[in-house]
């Protein structure tokens, strides 16, 4: 359906949904089936969210395919076949498109529509959103499905207009194929997108220069073609596994919880456990080796050093190996990266690593990248510099109420939410996997489904009681923020300058944004709030 056909009777909407990623699509499906007049507004030209924009070489999910999928329809989860253990971006995007087609969602999606502002009127309890083209539409409720990693960050360096070569960002990758053959390519950043793309870029490029400020831990994914017997066994118990996932810390079933401290076993036993997890592949498996890897620094040191020794054993040049060894954060306190041949790539003669912590980048020049001690001549620069995570997309929209509440002021010192779903002073505005919810520290699709189901139940409660307005109480929000901080402070997570803390964005407040009390504890809290008549919320006509 064309955008013109989708633009119909905007004032009759019950729910406006912003974003057509996995959260937005499920919200549309769920609410539409309950009889709500809902529509999605999406900046991109099609569905997919992060999987639409992130098309860089090697882009792949770090959650296994059989888990990273919707559970709301059994026929859907039985019929779709995943080709690999970990889904690559093209396959995941195919899956999301299949979901949109199977449930006829596109007829209620307006693409190529970027939301500029959202304003709430207390007079009629309605949100009015305005697009960058000046179009306006209103609804009783607004659901922000804007994603946690959807606002790409590019450093504020001089010289972007001076560089004569090509510039790309992994988070805004072109839809056409990019050929690196014969090119001198610079990759800036060694987070997830850098680690995933560098080995593939190196297979084509004449020379690759990697600019690294901070080394990150990366584990082997051990990706492989999907084994038919594994898929069949998994699908045979899908319903049980999906239910069990809600009783785990990360929302993924199938990982028996550890029972011992890393400090209660011998060094030989400890290293054998790490070796087994390393061979198995996957981040959760490794962090599940012992009970205290994310809460005890001494215990974590053993896991961190094991990983560093793996880097030293893989990278032949020991100076390069040491530069690739992370020392400034405990393993797991930044998002663990999964890779295929990342460290092996540095053994290639045409791949160099530049330490820009000791010699920072000053900017771009006509020829390439200038650091404080050298200029590197390049034909292409790939920025793998991450995102303004968790809050960036929301703050790009001018969200305010006629009572004077503004999102910029609200989150000036860091995000404040109740349950990561709503905010005090912003009635009828819901978030899917917002800050202070498990979101990015969980199986994201499961968390999206849990939030959408909770929001749908909330709207049904309002409808059944003849009410139309809901907003968190300030005290409930304050208590939840304090709880989120206390839970994080009981772990090692705040020790890392991570995007979880907003540390990758200059001037962004340093506050740990995800909820790390676990999916099980979080869902129980959300369910208890609802069961108590939406405790902590003010509900009115």
What is the predicted role of each segment?
Residues 177-184:
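Glycine-rich NAD(P)-binding loop of Rossmann-like domains
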Residues 198:
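Ligand/cofactor pocket segment of small-molecule handling proteins
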